[in-house]
Amino acid sequence: MKEKKKGNIIGILIVMAIIIFGVIYGGITLTKNWGKSKETISKENATGKLKKICKDININEVEPRKSPIDLGVKDVKDTIPNIDKYPAKVENTTDSYIEIFSTGEKAGNGKDGWLIDVANNFNESKFEINGKIISVKVREIASGLGMDYIISEKYLPDAYSPSNELWGEMIKANGKTIELCDDRMVGNVAGILISKEKYDELIKKYGAINLKNITQAVANGEINMGYTNPFASATGLNFLVSTLATFDSSNPLSEKAIDGFNEFQNNIPLIAYTTLQLRNSAESGILDGFIMEYQTYINSPELKTDYIFTPFGYRHDSPLYSVGNLSNEKKEILNKFIEFYKQDKYQELAVKDGFNALEDYKC
């Protein structure tokens, strides 16, 4: 009797389970589309429909079209900072003075501070012109940036000393008044530094190391080399001009020269804004060679140990220009300053700082 009763209970439970399952399933079926539009529901079968639609789509490849980009810059003046970003390294000590823009290898710190030492000594000497004590003010400005200030006339110094004469020629080409007063403050040379291992490899293949052979080695993918931005760096600009000339010495801007340079450029892994970036890349093993001035090279023991210096291009003798139409008083101050730093003791100081070497090298 008990077994019969137990069987009835099990049967009832089974029937109830079937009924509950049916109710739940039916509820889900009836409510699963509640709140959904027909459009939403149809997306559940999107894959199948998309396949049908794609069969009717034709694909045409269109050649990419270059479109002019408006950077919104109307003037170079808008792209360079206010001069306050570059405070004077030597302040004038009198009201009668000239201000000089100078590059960092001679207006920097330590061995790069030759002009700073000279200017301070000049000011301490208290020279007079027409009964007035005179002085100089020195601001450290890179060659390219100094040119931008002068061309844009955002800020005009009285005198400008880039690393080489290429910048002065560009300023003249832009119609600005600039006059070469001294073609050499201190002697210096641009060069290519090549690791000793790579140098030996190139000697075996080419027999000599010069700019022409180096550019050929780069074009052949035999050496990884970097250089600095020619719009900012004097060494970079010198390298650009000199490299173009290796492809066509009669016309560095000819199609032949440009094609040769483009082939060369395709194998350049790095164009850096500063020499420091190049040095860091070389230390990491990315580069076999890079460009640098001799004065910096000779003052860096680790570079002399690992790299060989090969000079190239125009000399970097730090010419000195007057800027604009100077008053007679300012012209006299400038001439007095030139006379001052030309003294043997200041040229000997320049030698101690790494300048006035490789005197026999000519472009």
Language model features by range: what are they?
Residues 3-18:
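N-terminal Sec-pathway targeting helices
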Residues 13-14, 35-232:
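N-terminal segment of the mature folded domain
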Residues 23-39:
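Hydrophobic single-pass membrane-insertion segments
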Residues 101-105, 218-250, 261-268:
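Short beta-strand->loop
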Residues 182-191, 231, 261-264, 298-327, 331, 340-363, ...:
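Periplasmic-binding protein-like
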Residues 197-206, 232-233, 245-253, 325-334:
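Short helix-loop capping/hinge motifs at secondary-structure junctions, enriched
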Residues 245-309:
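Ligand-binding pocket segment of bilobal, Venus flytrap-like solute-binding proteins
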